[in-house]
């Protein structure tokens, strides 16, 4: 089974992936554009990459760039290149994950960035699975764990992608059970993030340029596979985390229809909330970091309750990907009944995502509302 990854390492995703993961998503890195523009040396291979549609040739050029300027600058160069956020670009960026694994082994994972929907992580983890199965994955996750929850949760998500690609798309349940094996093998391994990665991979499941016929998707059933009785209840929450992305495809980007025809009709409250959470994260990359756009798109939710929830999720998503301005602007403009949830989410993220040089007090100063600023400082 592992040999399948070696054969398909460069062809397993060729469709656009639009979720928010967490993720889609780094508006905070837009400031790096100037640095890229100044670095004309990066333009050499990037220009050639953009001039061809042949993936094999693009991989050769990208590898050359990685070797010349280093993995970090190469990833920035590709991100700022203007290449579309399509499956082919996602797949191309797997190259840096392959490179890092081959050169540094499991320790190389920490040099991955989450650009192009964490494709460096995906390429790296797939390579680890092909190289040594669960043992190598565990070694890589050990390095992730040292970096804290914000990093190791993302690694677990990438591992979930790899488990399904390795098992084969018809073996969705097997991949989910492999996540359970990982929980028993690796300390602090977050099961939900792995399940989430499995279900996200099931949505895209692309081989040779078209969705695999083996993926668990029914175009006439927007609740499938979350309503499939073969899937254990403990996995269903992660299924609903991704279902809005699938429905968004089915309804050709009609956010209001996804909200009213899919999420609003989910009967169990826990699953319904996760559906709206997934839809809010689907909205996040569409906002382009603009608080006004967030408020506009979230107004498409079917009630004020879900409107506020959508706004709060987007504020948190913006903070998680590095934006230190928009989240505070978003919470300042949410309706009064939504402020507690919005600011509460941001304040908890400030602690969870605190970086060495960040000063909480200076971040609190960005809260424009005095009462909430005091709560932030306390």
Predicted feature locations:
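N-terminal Sec-pathway targeting helices
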Residues: 2-18
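Non-catalytic tandem-repeat scaffold regions and their flanking low-complexity/translocation tails
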Residues: 12, 25-378
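Sec-dependent, cleavable N-terminal signal peptides
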Residues: 19-23
């Amino acid at each position: 089974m592992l040999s399948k990854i070696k054969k398909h390492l460069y062809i397993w995703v060729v469709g656009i992936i639009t979720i928010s993961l967490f993720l889609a998503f780094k508006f905070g890195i837009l400031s790096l554009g100037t640095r890229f523009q100044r670095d004309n040396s990066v333009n050499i291979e990037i220009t050639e990459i953009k001039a061809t549609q042949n993936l094999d040739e693009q991989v050769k050029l990208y590898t050359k760039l990685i070797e010349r300027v280093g993995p970090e600058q190469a990833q920035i160069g590709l991100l700022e290149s203007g290449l579309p956020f399509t499956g082919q670009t996602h797949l191309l960026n797997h190259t840096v994950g392959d490179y890092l694994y081959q050169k540094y082994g499991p320790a190389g994972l920490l040099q991955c960035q989450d650009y192009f929907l964490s494709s460096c992580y995906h390429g790296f983890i797939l390579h680890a699975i092909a190289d040594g199965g669960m043992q190598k994955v565990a070694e890589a996750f050990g390095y992730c764990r040292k970096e804290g929850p914000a990093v190791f949760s993302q690694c677990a998500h990438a591992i979930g992608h790899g488990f399904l690609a390795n098992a084969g798309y018809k073996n969705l349940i097997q991949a989910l059970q492999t996540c359970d094996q990982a929980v028993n093998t690796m300390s602090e391994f977050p099961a939900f993030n792995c399940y989430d990665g499995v279900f996200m991979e099931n949505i895209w499941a692309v081989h040779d340029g078209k969705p695999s016929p083996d993926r668990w998707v029914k175009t006439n059933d927007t609740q499938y596979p979350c309503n499939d009785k073969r899937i254990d209840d403990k996995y269903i929450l992660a299924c609903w985390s991704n279902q809005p992305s699938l429905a968004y495809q089915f309804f050709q980007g009609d956010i209001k229809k996804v909200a009213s025809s899919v999420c609003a009709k989910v009967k169990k409250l826990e699953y319904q909330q996760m559906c709206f959470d997934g839809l809010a994260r689907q909205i996040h990359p569409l906002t382009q970091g603009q608080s006004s756009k967030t408020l506009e798109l979230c107004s498409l939710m079917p009630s004020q309750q879900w409107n506020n929830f959508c706004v709060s999720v987007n504020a948190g998503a913006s903070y998680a990907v590095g934006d230190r301005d928009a989240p505070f602007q978003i919470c300042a403009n949410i309706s009064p009944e939504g402020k507690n949830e919005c600011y509460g989410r941001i304040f908890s993220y400030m602690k969870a995502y605190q970086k060495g040089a960040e000063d909480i007090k200076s971040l609190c100063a960005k809260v424009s509302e005095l009462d909430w600023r005091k709560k932030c400082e306390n």
